[in-house]
A protein has these predicted regions:
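Structural motif
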Residues: 1, 20-23, 50-53, 83-84, ...
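Surface-exposed amphipathic alpha-helices with a cationic face
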Residues: 16, 99-106
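Active-site-proximal loop->helix
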Residues: 1-44, 117, 121-132, 146-147
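Short glycine/serine/threonine-rich phosphate/pyrophosphate-binding segments
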Residues: 1, 7-12, 88-99, 121, ...
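Phosphate-binding loop/pocket of nucleotide- and phosphate-handling active sites
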Residues: 135, 190-203
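Fold-independent oxyanion-binding glycine-rich loops
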Residues: 3-5, 26, 55-58, 70, ...
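Active-site/ligand-binding loops adjacent to catalytic centers
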Residues: 38, 50, 104-183
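Active-site/ligand-binding-proximal alpha/beta "capping" segment
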Residues: 48-89, 152, 156, 160-179
Length: 203
């Protein structure tokens, strides 16, 4: 299992506890760098017999799975009684697949992506230009390149959040709601609150 060094030690220990071999790679290198987790995972898959390289950044099964499962689950559990769907943006699979399904069911609904400061999605959505990404601590969302699994056709707005906002919201959810979650969940909720406030809702 290959992961960047900004991932929490708890995740690494949990994987090792169930027998996984974990290879930790540096975060602050370009995707093309041979030390990046993209490059290392691809190399290990090529060198390992019977290995499967999921390639979640360019595998159409990623958004398709969310189209077939996550979208219908949200629709069934809410009975379509919602106006906005908010999700963190990492590989783009969740927001692309789920957003596509929900917009087919309810075209007027709004899909909001949440992006950490340091990632390039926010600037790309607003300007159409790729900017240079820089480091951030939130795990699991944000990107320093454009995966083919990210389709902005299904995204209506992108909200930018700071590391502090993500961590603070994750702690708030644990303390006040009893929801044991990580920073990317905190990011999504912080982004949802920001969007609601932008729309004039008091939170």
């Amino acid at each position: 299992f290959i992961m960047p060094d900004k991932m929490s030690m708890e995740k690494i220990k949990a994987l090792r506890a169930v027998g996984a071999k974990v290879v930790v790679t540096p975060t602050d290198v370009e995707p093309e760098d041979p030390r990046s987790y993209y490059s290392v995972s691809r190399r290990i898959a090529e060198e390992t017999p019977n290995a499967f390289y999921a390639n979640q950044y360019h595998n159409p099964s990623n958004p398709e799975t969310h189209y077939k499962t996550t979208g219908p689950e949200i629709w069934e559990q809410t009975q379509g009684d919602f106006d906005v769907f908010v999700a963190g943006m990492g590989t783009g699979g969740t927001i692309t697949g789920t957003g596509r399904y929900l917009k087919e069911k309810k075209p007027e609904m709004i899909t909001v992506g949440v992006d950490p400061v340091g990632s390039l999605y926010y600037d790309y959505f607003k300007t159409g230009k790729l900017t240079e990404a820089h480091s951030y601590k939130v795990e699991g969302i944000g990107e320093d390149f454009l995966p083919s699994t990210m389709n902005f056709e299904y995204v209506d707005e992108v909200i930018r959040v700071t590391d502090k906002e993500c961590f603070d919201m994750a702690r708030r959810l644990v303390r006040h709601e009893g929801v044991l979650c990580g920073q990317s969940c905190g990011a999504s909720v912080a982004g949802a609150v920001k969007y609601a406030e932008m729309m004039g809702r008091k939170m």
